[in-house]
Regions:
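Active-site microenvironment of metallo-dependent hydrolases
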Residues: 1-103
Length: 103
């Protein structure tokens, strides 16, 4: 997790897949973590490294990087996860991630 977070900080946003201490997929999205300054063809090639990385890690979901992107985009309806907390977008409130003592 630390390697992934540090890599994203280094490239100023994007998507990364890490396995066994190695970055195996990376696409830099330096504009708000959503858009790239690179040509579409280059971004498509890098996005393929993300998809291959997910498959290498055992994820067989259809287009998992887009599913994860939707989760974090806090302007979408319902609940969203931000870098700060869980957001109830419908009621414009922040929700605790952990409620009460762990059992």
């Amino acid at each position: 997790m630390a390697l992934a977070a540090n890599k994203l900080a280094e490239v100023e946003g994007g998507q990364v897949v890490v396995k066994d201490g190695q970055v195996i997929g990376l696409v830099e999205l330096a504009i708000g973590g959503l858009m790239s300054t690179e040509r579409a063809e280059t971004v498509a090639e890098k996005t393929n490294t993300i998809l291959k990385g997910f498959r290498t890690c055992g994820c067989n979901l259809n287009n998992p990087n887009m599913q994860l992107s939707r989760l974090a985009l806090v302007v979408n309806p319902e609940l969203r996860l931000s870098d700060k907390c869980l957001v109830d977008v419908t009621h414009f409130t922040f929700l605790p991630v952990i409620e009460g003592p762990a059992k």
